[in-house]
Amino acid sequence: MWFLILFLALSLGGIDAAPPVQSRIVGGFKCEKNSQPWQVAVYYHKEHICGGVLLDRNWVLTAAHCYVDECEVWLGKNQLFQEEPSAQNRLVSKSFPHPGFNMTLLTFEKLPPGADFSNDLMLLRLSKPADITDVVKPIDLPTKEPKLDSTCLVSGWGSITPTKWQKPDDLQCMFTKLLPNENCAKAYLLKVTDVMLCTIEMGEDKGPCVGDSGGPLICDGVLQGTVSIGPDPCGIPGVSAIYTNLVKFNSWIKDTMMKNA
């Protein structure tokens, strides 16, 4: 049985906030420039830790296991380590992890058998609205479940190697395919629920990794999920990755944004 890995980029501030983590895309390819204008880079103390998705000018969606006491985001970036005039930096004024996410799981070095990692999503309220431009654009939430066998695109600046953390400069993309959740239930000891999506990478030695957590899963042109958990090491051939199924959370997302506008 494969160990689970959270796609978070580092052990935060000496706090054992997550199991050993990996968050890059292994076996991906350089995304076409500005092709993912909703892609967000989440930072903690100037260090990239997670991905995210811009939902509107004031809100970013990411993974609950990316929670830290204070963070900031970069929007409109293509290259992680380069200054880009079109990129925008915003502080996060408040974080809203989903109340159903079990934060105590982040204290484990390895997730225990039967652990329920459901509800792994979090909203970030920006301190200043994003400027919508050609390279910074929000993406709509899904309105219906994705179809099985859909071809999906995942993107992020997570590690590009499975066992040694190596961040890419260029935003990485990777194609993956939606599977029945039963496939993930067979591959993992944790509980697999209907608020999760299960994917298999199209090719060997591919998959999201450390730093990709919270990044978008786009299926047939529609945002359907955010990166959650996967095998350790990343990109094990034939082993599925798990994403948060966003259509299940439309009400919570919209209510939280409205009540904290």
Swiss-Prot record:
Keywords: Disulfide bond, Glycoprotein, Hydrolase, Protease, Serine protease, Signal, Zymogen. The keyword Hydrolase applies. Residues 25-258 form the Peptidase S1 domain. Its EC number is 3.4.21.54. It comes from the Eukaryota. Glycans are attached at N102. Belongs to the peptidase S1 family. Kallikrein subfamily. This is Kallikrein 1-related peptidase b16. It comes from Mus musculus (Mouse).
